C-alpha cells in the first residue's frame, strides 16, 4: 500500500482522486491547499478520499510519496522542503524548471535528502523514446503545440492578439522551450518536458498556435539524431474543468502512482 500526500486540489488533483478512489493500493493521507481554498477542498476530499485530511503544509507527516498537482509555486514551497527531508516526490508542473535555478535547486534538495524527484510526462507521449535517443545523441527536437484560442486567455497572447476574433490558426509564440515555459507557464509544461528529456530548454525549438477551429490540444514532436528520427502527434481532449490542461495529464499521474503502488509496472 502506497501512502500518498498531494499538493493541489484543482482540476488535476480532483481528477486524480476520482480515478484512484477505488484503488486499494493507493491511499491519500493529506491534501495540501492554500488556506483560502480549504473549505472548498474539504468538500471534494470528503467525497473522493474520505480518509485524507486537508492541510496547508505537510508539517511532520512522512508519506511514501508527495505528488505536486498545484502549479509552479508549489515546487519552492512544498517540493523542495520535502525532498530535503528525504521524501520522494513527483512533479506535474515541469514548466517550473524553466525558471532560473529551479532545476538545480530540485536536484540539490533531492541529493541532500538522499531521495529522488520524478518529472511526469503529463500530456505528451514518447518521452521514454526521446530520453533514450539522447543517450546516442540528438541533433534536433522541435515541439509544436496547438490549442483552442480560448485556452490562451489570460496569457501574453491575449495582449498581442484578439483571440475571439481569430479566423485561422495563428502562431502566438516561436522560440526556445525556456522562453515558452516562462511566458506561458500554464500552457507550456509539455514544451518543458520535451526539452528536459531531449536537448534541453535552450536548444529545443517551440512553436505555439492559437486555433479558433481546434477542439483538442494537439502536440507534435519531431526529433532527429544518431538513432534515426521520429514524429509524434497527439490529440488530447482538454479537461472540462480547465481548458489549459489535457486530460492525459491526469491519467499520467494516475499511471505513475499505480506504477509505484502495484506489483507490476510498465
From Swiss-Prot:
The active site is at residue 219. InterPro entries: Asp/hSer_DH_NAD-bd, Asp_DH, Asp_DH_prok, L-Asp_DH, NAD(P)-bd_dom_sf. It holds the Pfam family NAD_binding_3. It catalyses: L-aspartate + NADP(+) + H2O = oxaloacetate + NH4(+) + NADPH + H(+); L-aspartate + NAD(+) + H2O = oxaloacetate + NH4(+) + NADH + H(+). The keyword Coiled coil does not apply. It comes from the Bacteria. Disulfide bonds: none annotated. GO terms for biological process: NAD biosynthetic process. The keyword NAD applies. Its EC number is 1.4.1.21. GO terms for molecular function: aspartate dehydrogenase activity; NAD binding; NADP binding; oxidoreductase activity, acting on the CH-NH2 group of donors, NAD or NADP as acceptor. Keywords: NAD, NADP, Oxidoreductase, Pyridine nucleotide biosynthesis. NAD(+) binds at residues 123, 189. Pathway: Cofactor biosynthesis; NAD(+) biosynthesis; iminoaspartate from L-aspartate (dehydrogenase route): step 1/1. Specifically catalyzes the NAD or NADP-dependent dehydrogenation of L-aspartate to iminoaspartate. Belongs to the L-aspartate dehydrogenase family. The iminoaspartate product is unstable in aqueous solution and can decompose to oxaloacetate and ammonia. NCBIfam families: PRK13303.1-2, PRK13303.1-3. This is L-aspartate dehydrogenase. It comes from Cupriavidus taiwanensis (strain DSM 17343 / BCRC 17206 / CCUG 44338 / CIP 107171 / LMG 19424 / R1). The lineage of its organism: Bacteria, Pseudomonadati, Pseudomonadota, Betaproteobacteria, Burkholderiales. The gene is nadX.
